[in-house]
Amino acid sequence: MKIDGTVTTGLGKAAYFLSQDFYVNNFKKNCGFRPYPGTLNVIVPEEYLPQINKVKNECKNIIKPDEGFGAVKYIKARLNDEVTGAIVFPAKTTHEENYLEFIAKDKLRDKLNLEDGDTVSVEF
């Protein structure tokens, strides 16, 4: 599935969670990279929500961390046909349903010169 979406500013909470060893070590082991401590937030059209929710609900990749932290489902993905990473689905989130959170080894706003309002494609 390939979806175009719009880059938006997140809440800034992912940096803390993606700095925790149990998340970092799991992503490194299972996705092949140490994630940059932050996500690229992408708003996708609501028409894709049924397919996204199906993927999320059927996802078997899950990190179950220490007590006090939420579980995270993830699927490997590509951004703009050039960056390999993953989409994360945190069990505890305050984002709307049509937000995708993309992680990669680099700070994607800098690497791809992205700003709020830019269009990106996410494939998973």
Curated annotation (Swiss-Prot):
Positions of Mg(2+) binding: T39, N41
EC number: 2.7.1.161
Required cofactor names: Mg(2+)
Note accompanying the cofactor annotation: Binds 1 Mg(2+) ion per subunit.
Gene Ontology biological process terms, A to Z: FMN biosynthetic process; riboflavin biosynthetic process
Keyword Metal-binding belongs to the record: yes
Residues reported in the UniProt entry to bind FMN: T93, E101
Pathway(s) it belongs to: Cofactor biosynthesis; FMN biosynthesis; FMN from riboflavin (CTP route): step 1/1
GO function terms (MF aspect): magnesium ion binding; nucleotide binding; riboflavin kinase activity
Keywords: Flavoprotein, FMN, Kinase, Magnesium, Metal-binding, Nucleotide-binding, Transferase
Catalytic activities: riboflavin + CTP = CDP + FMN + H(+)
Residues bound to CDP: G10, L11, G12, K13, A14, A15, D106, K107, L108, R109
Pfam families membership: CTP-dep_RFKase
Functional summary from the UniProt entry: Catalyzes the CTP-dependent phosphorylation of riboflavin (vitamin B2) to form flavin mononucleotide (FMN).
Protein family membership: Belongs to the archaeal riboflavin kinase family.
Protein name: Riboflavin kinase
Species this chain originates from: Methanobrevibacter smithii (strain ATCC 35061 / DSM 861 / OCM 144 / PS)
